[in-house]
Amino acid sequence: LEGINRMDLTLVSSNFTKEVIQNSVFDKKDQNTGQLLGQLKLEKPVEVLFEGIDLEVYNEKAPSEDRINKVMMDIEEPFAFLFVGHWLKGEFQQDRKNVSGLIWTFLNTFKNKSKAPALILKTSSGGTSLVDRVRIKKMIEQIKTAVKEDTKATKLPNIYLLHSDLTDWEMNALYNHPKV
């Protein structure tokens, strides 16, 4: 509580945590005499940080979005796996979300298949610059080359890069698209 009281505002992840902090009271005693000096209790605001989803936006009833429909028309496969997340720094299979490992596993699982699904990577390294897009495409190609060399694969499944910011409604349309 002493640390929390030094903050202007403390954010917690649940109402339970907020209530525990708000209801916590400790007696402060002199270590030598044991005499009660006062009480330690919450003096600063604590708020719950919403970490859920907005069901008014993310649901199966939402209409399709033109931008998503246009992107998905370019995907020839009837089914695609979707990955959404940042592809952060790190060597092969050492990046935080192991996107490189995901790609490696996907390619190895569906190599040389006549009716392989696609993989849609809705990713960036934290920005949507052209430099970032080119770098990510290069990393995907490096992994494809490594899989071909290691396994002598003659055919690899398609990977599509969706490298842009999307609105919540566009994301919902992507999650609910029939190909995903």
Task: Briefly describe each language-model feature range.
Residues R6-M7, L40-V46, E149-Y160:
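A short helix-to-beta-strand connector/capping loop
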Residues M7-N15, I21:
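A short beta-strand/loop micro-motif in the catalytic core of glycosyltransferases
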Residues F16, G52:
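Carbohydrate-associated surface elements
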Residues L55-W169, A173-H177:
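Conserved catalytic-core segment of nucleotide-activated headgroup transferases in glycan assembly
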Residues L1-T10, L36:
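Membrane-proximal helix-turn-helix segments that form the acceptor-binding/catalytic region
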Residues S24-F50:
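P-loop/Walker A phosphate-binding loop and immediately adjacent motor/lid segment at beta-alpha junctions
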